[in-house]
Structure formats: C-alpha cells, structure tokens
C-alpha cells in the first residue's frame, strides 16, 4: 500500500510503499527513549520506494544495543521522529515511524521484538482484538 505522512509542523512530508503485514513494535530501550513511550511502532519500507516530498530531515547516527548503527531522521523544526536507516543505505530499507503516517489506523502491528526490554504491561497481545477508546 502507498503510505504518506510527515512531521508535526508540516515542514517534512514523505511517501513510500509499505506492506501492512510487516508492521512491528520495538521494545528496545533506544525506541523507548526516542519515542518517549514504552515502545515504538515501525513499518519497514524499501529504500527505493521512500520519497521525500518536501523538507530535509536532520540525521544523526546512533549505535544500538545490539551494536548495529542506525541513522535517526527527525524534523529539525519540531523534532518529530520520522524514520531510521542504516548508514550508507546498507540495509536497503527505512524504518518509518507509524505515528507519522496518515494511514496509521490501517498499519496494525503484526510482530514485536526486543521484548526482554519491554516495560511491565506494555507487551501488546497482537492476536487479540483491542478495545477502542
């Protein structure tokens, strides 16, 4: 499916093709810190399909818990986290932050990882329906 979205202030907009079956929740401590929450929801998109429509994100490189390096992209104006990517395009995909997409209601998590770092009561029961409030 085609997804689009952007930052909170509107300075950065993007479009990409995503597989809604690959939406994931990450419980690593980096994602907890960077999201300001107990976890982050991400959809991987092929780097070739990702297109910046306007704006230029600020990038910085972070070494993850497992030793891998990831570029973190965020809006330089409002600070919205937009995506992560491997340095020099090594992995060929971007981890788009689902909360920045306009289709977030259709990007339902199917998997979760780094569960050993999960906060108490934050593991999502993916196979069970959730109550909408």
Predicted regions and their residues:
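Flanking scaffold residues of small Cys/His-coordinated metal-binding clusters
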Residues: 1-4, 21-23, 69-70
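Short Fe-S-cluster ligation motifs
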Residues: 57-68, 102-123
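Helix-adjacent hinge/juxtasegments
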Residues: 43-77, 81-84
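Cys/His-rich metal-chelating microdomains
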Residues: 12, 29-34, 81
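Short, non-ligating residues that shape and space the ligands of small metal-coordination modules
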Residues: 15-16, 37, 84-85
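Single conserved hydrophobic/aromatic residue that forms the stacking wall/gate
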Residues: 124-133
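Short cysteine-rich clusters marking metal-coordination/redox-active sites
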Residues: 6-9, 26-28, 75
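Short cysteine/histidine-rich metal-coordination sites, predominantly Zn2+-binding motifs
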Residues: 22-27, 41-51, 90-101
């Amino acid at each position: 499916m085609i997804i689009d979205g952007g930052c909170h202030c509107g300075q950065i907009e993007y479009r990409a093709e995503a597989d809604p079956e690959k939406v994931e929740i990450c419980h690593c401590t980096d994602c907890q810190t960077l999201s300001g929450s107990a976890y982050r929801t991400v959809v991987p998109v092929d780097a070739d399909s990702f297109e910046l429509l306007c704006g230029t994100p600020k990038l910085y490189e972070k070494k993850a818990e497992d030793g891998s390096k990831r570029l973190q992209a965020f809006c330089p104006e409002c600070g919205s986290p937009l995506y992560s990517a491997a340095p020099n395009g090594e992995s060929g995909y971007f981890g788009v932050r689902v909360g920045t997409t306009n289709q977030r209601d259709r990007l339902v998590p199917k998997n979760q990882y780094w569960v050993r770092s999960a906060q108490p009561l934050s593991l999502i029961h993916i196979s069970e329906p959730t109550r909408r409030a």
